[in-house]
């Protein structure tokens, strides 16, 4: 499925938050995933960036090694170092001191859906500040076309023809 329309649709749903979201996606990117699952993934990572960032978010999508790499980067404080290894674990919340909302399931759902579709998710701190969530999903495989051997009329037998018994 093409991801660019869903990417723009997901970003548009967060326009009312006042966040400054820029999107840069290569044209004609396709991934092997259920559209509703991709919507849930994009919603969760964008919600995370808006909740923990400072209002400036960059969304990117590009092809890489038979996959599509989707990045969502905020310019907030980034993840605490101890949080990075468990960012996608269930019921894990990054910052309870800031009065953060949520159940700690958003990124766990992202990881589960991404893995289900043959991809992976990771969280990093960007060297220039802020956190980055990266989702990698496989591109569709081209259809398999097996070359079948040619069959000629001399290769087939007519089932209606009587069996020749003259040699017997």
Swiss-Prot record:
Limits of the Histidine kinase domain: 1-141
A Pfam family reported for this protein in Swiss-Prot or TrEMBL: HATPase_c
Entry keyword set: ATP-binding, Kinase, Nucleotide-binding, Transferase, Two-component regulatory system
InterPro entries (UniProt xref): 2C_sensor_his_kinase, HATPase_C_sf, His_kinase_dom, Sig_transdc_His_kin-like_C
EC number(s) given by UniProt: 2.7.13.3
Signal peptide limits: none
Ranges of compositional bias, category Basic and acidic residues: 143-168
CDD domains on file: HATPase
Record region (Disordered): 137-168
SMART domains linked to this entry: HATPase_c
GO MF assignments: ATP binding; phosphorelay response regulator activity; protein histidine kinase activity; protein kinase activity
A single GO BP: negative regulation of phosphorelay signal transduction system
Keyword GTP-binding on entry: no
Catalyzed reactions: ATP + protein L-histidine = ADP + protein N-phospho-L-histidine
PANTHER family: SENSOR PROTEIN CREC, SENSOR PROTEIN RSTB
Record's function text: Member of the three-protein two-component system HK1/HK2/TcrA. Kinase that binds ATP and catalyzes the transfer of a phosphoryl group from ATP to HK2.
Subunit structure: Interacts with HK2.
Additional information: HK1 and HK2 are merged into a single protein with a distinct N-terminal sequence in strain CDC 1551 / Oshkosh.
The protein's name in its UniProt record: Sensor histidine kinase component HK1
Species: Mycobacterium tuberculosis (strain ATCC 25618 / H37Rv)
């Amino acid at each position: 499925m093409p991801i660019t329309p869903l990417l723009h649709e997901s970003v548009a749903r967060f326009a009312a938050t006042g966040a400054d979201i820029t999107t840069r996606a290569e044209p004609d990117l396709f991934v092997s995933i259920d559209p509703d699952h991709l919507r849930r993934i994009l919603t969760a990572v964008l919600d995370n960036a808006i909740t923990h960032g400072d209002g400036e978010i960059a969304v990117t999508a590009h092809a890489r090694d038979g996959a599509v790499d989707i990045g969502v980067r905020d310019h907030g404080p980034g993840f605490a170092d101890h949080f990075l290894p468990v960012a996608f674990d269930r019921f894990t919340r990054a910052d309870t001191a800031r009065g953060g909302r949520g159940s700690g399931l958003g990124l766990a759902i992202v990881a589960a859906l991404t893995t289900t579709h043959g991809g992976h998710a990771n969280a990093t701190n960007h060297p220039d500040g802020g956190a980055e969530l990266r989702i990698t999903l496989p591109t569709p495989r081209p259809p398999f076309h097996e070359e079948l051997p040619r069959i000629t009329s001399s290769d087939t037998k007519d089932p209606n023809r009587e069996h020749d018994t003259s040699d017997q």
